[in-house]
Amino acid sequence: MPIQQLPLMKGVGKDFRNADYIDYLPVNMLATPKEILNSSGYLRSFPGIAKRSDVNGVSRGVEYNMAQNAVYRVCGGKLYKGESEVGDVAGSGRVSMAHDRTSQAVGVNGQLVEYRYDGTVKTVSNWPTDSGFTQYELGSVRDITRLRGRYAWSKDGTDSWFITDLEDESHPDRYSAQYRAESQPDGIIGIGTWRDFIVCFGSSTIEYFSLTGATTVGAALYVAQPSLMVQKGIAGTYCKTPFADSYAFISNPATGAPSVYIIGSGQVSPIASASIEKILRSYTADELAEGVMESLRFDAHELLIIHLPRHVLVYDASSSANGPQWCVLKTGLYDDVYRAIDFIYEGNQITCGDKLESVTGKLQFDISSQYDKQQEHLLFTPLFKADNARVFDLEVESSTGVAQYADRLFLSATTDGINYGREQMIEQNEPFVYDKRVLWKRVGRIRKNVGFKLRVITKSPVTLSGCQIRIE
């Protein structure tokens, strides 16, 4: 009687709308490539969230300030250094953040506001007219960054970007402040730094600028590097993030159907699977522009997290040797969007903001709950052929014993890849029972094809691997 191994990293089913085969991605579960009990890896629940502190509002942005060795976070109308308030921030939308030796800068409401470490607050503006220095049309700030002692910001709706003065960072450079990304006539959507380059992200190109080293008064300090230009654009200001020693971004619909790419030496390489591209394609250009990307690292996982209005998608670079490995994060027992955002390593823990409430949280690896609420974890197996066969002993390896009370795993089967039948409840966790078996002894007779869904609702961490069945 043959025993068949079933992978859990990605299920396969059908879309009832168009009869296409689709991927059923793990929900709230991360794949870990590690040899465990005849399996090439296992799946582990995404760390839970515990409350850390009350704040002024929902999270709007975060940055680790190396000058102060502290995390600066914008929540609601306040700027926080660690858990203490250090300033007021106008508006309610996402903000761009950068820092210097003397100040923490926030790009908000079209202005570049500098919260200096001595307690004063300055807004970048032109030099006084009687100074004799060039007066610039500064316009509205869209995105900010910093490189080599200067802040740089992009002017909203234009292809211009500016740099601050070396001596007084609250004013543009007195001689050569303005530069243009001339391949982006529709305007610079975002700006960032990579190694020693200023990176300007447009809707159809990504342009790099490097220092010229000029010391002559009035000479250009930055010059475009056409050899590094990328013929893809980003969907929105925050649809980019440093990742894997480069940048990852969601492409703009102006260059074709949106996807997720990583830049490398003037080229882009896609990391999105067909199912991820289907999800991105379900959004309009305006909805996609609201996306936020961030990177997170823990326990050898290199995660790229994409926050979209209706989905939170996670790409794990460490598990993608045999193809891109994605999963979905969600909150609650239905399809509510994942609530945590703005992850950052702080002290010896990972802290996060919140999209729904005025709190900050911290990731805890000994729970899978979010603010003491149970979460749902879903895994799927691919469809496989079992023509006129009887199926017994569906078993999953589970790391048990850490639950505070007996948890059940819900197993259901599909024969068409669309509809899953009645759920079978199996105890999968119990306090101090560390070798508990998760076993469905009699599955039934299969006419043609079959696939399985595993569902766990718990506050405890979930670790599953090695799904197998016996076929007669």
Task: State where each predicted segment sits.
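Residue-level signature of beta-propeller blades and closely related beta-rich strand-turn architectures
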Residues: 77, 110-111, 157, 204, ...
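Beta-propeller and closely related beta-pinwheel folds
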Residues: 47-58, 84-93, 124-292
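Beta-sheet repeat architectures centered on beta-propellers
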Residues: 1-103, 231-246, 252-472
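Hydrophobic or amphipathic alpha-helical targeting/insertion segments
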Residues: 97-132
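Short beta-strand segments and strand-loop junctions that repeat across beta-rich extracellular domains
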Residues: 113-117, 154-172, 206, 312-320, ...
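Residues that form or flank phosphate/diphosphate-binding pockets in enzymes
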Residues: 107, 201, 389
